[in-house]
């Protein structure tokens, strides 16, 4: 059985990157919540 985590920076950015978050209303909600909480890093 292969391991489930096969790292790829491209996939990482495309699914969890800033532009991916900004592309949907819910993604923008995620960013707003992380800003409100005071996260040092908003994405990835």
UniProtKB/Swiss-Prot annotation:
PROSITE patterns: RIBOSOMAL_L34 (PS00784). This is Large ribosomal subunit protein bL34. Pfam families: Ribosomal_L34. The lineage of its organism: Bacteria, Pseudomonadati, Pseudomonadota, Gammaproteobacteria, Aeromonadales. It comes from Aeromonas hydrophila subsp. hydrophila (strain ATCC 7966 / DSM 30187 / BCRC 13018 / CCUG 14551 / JCM 1027 / KCTC 2358 / NCIMB 9240 / NCTC 8049). Disulfide bonds: none annotated. Belongs to the bacterial ribosomal protein bL34 family. GO terms for cellular component: ribonucleoprotein complex; ribosome. NCBIfam families: rpmH_bact. Keywords: Ribonucleoprotein, Ribosomal protein. It comes from the Bacteria.
